[in-house]
Structure formats: C-alpha cells, structure tokens
Amino acid sequence: NKLLISELSGGMVKRVSIARAIVMNPKYLLCDEPNSGLDPKTAIIIDNLIQEITLESNITTIVNTHDMNSVMEIGEVIAYINNGEICWSGSKEELINNSNTQLNDFVFASKLFKRLKKNQ
C-alpha cells in the first residue's frame, strides 16, 4: 500500500516505527511508551511484535511504559524508576511479591494487579 503517514492507524504507525528502528540491525532498541494511544487488542499485537523482534534479532530492548499489562507480558528484567533514580529492579515474580510500599502503590493501582496481589 502507498499510504501517507497521516492515513495510517495508530497501530500501523507503531509497526512502521519499529520497522524503521530495526532496519539497521541495532544492538539496542528503546521503545518509549510503545502502546500509548492504542486499543488493548492492538497493544497486545505490539507487545508480541517487540518480543518477537527482541528474541529473533538478539536485540536488547528497553521499554519505557506505565502499562503494567505490557510490563508483565514482555518484561524480563523490570526496573521501577522514580525521579530519575532506579528504586527497584527484578523479575516479574519479584515485582508481584515485593514489599516496597512506593512500588506497590504504583504497580497495584490497577484493579487487575490488586486482584493478583490479593491471590498471592
């Protein structure tokens, strides 16, 4: 298709941006809020795309996001940064079971994660 950028959907723009970023085979890929403005179904597609690219191309990928669903879907090592300082880092399991009050307030603000924590 020969569409102008203004004619692309939000998900298509994200895919094009990712393709442009990896075309030169970088060692690192930085994704800043890759799911912002996307519906949940498209966000999952973008998460899967990032995961696939990371694994197949052996690219170290850093994802900056506030979307806890994305964090749990694609995060291997997760870091919580507040005011430019890394306050916590660890695995998904460590994130769910942590005792850091500030981190818990942020992570479990979502109803989904409140239920997850309650079931632990």
List PLM regions with ranges.
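Helix N-cap at the start of a conserved alpha-helix in ABC-type nucleotide-binding domains
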Residues: 40-42
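Conserved catalytic motifs of ABC-family nucleotide-binding domains
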Residues: 25
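Conserved ABC ATPase signature
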Residues: 4-8, 12
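Catalytic Walker B motif of ABC-type/P-loop ATPase nucleotide-binding domains
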Residues: 29-32
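H-loop/switch region of ABC-family ATPase nucleotide-binding domains
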Residues: 65-66
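C-terminal boundary and immediately downstream tail of ABC-type ATPase nucleotide-binding domains
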Residues: 96-120
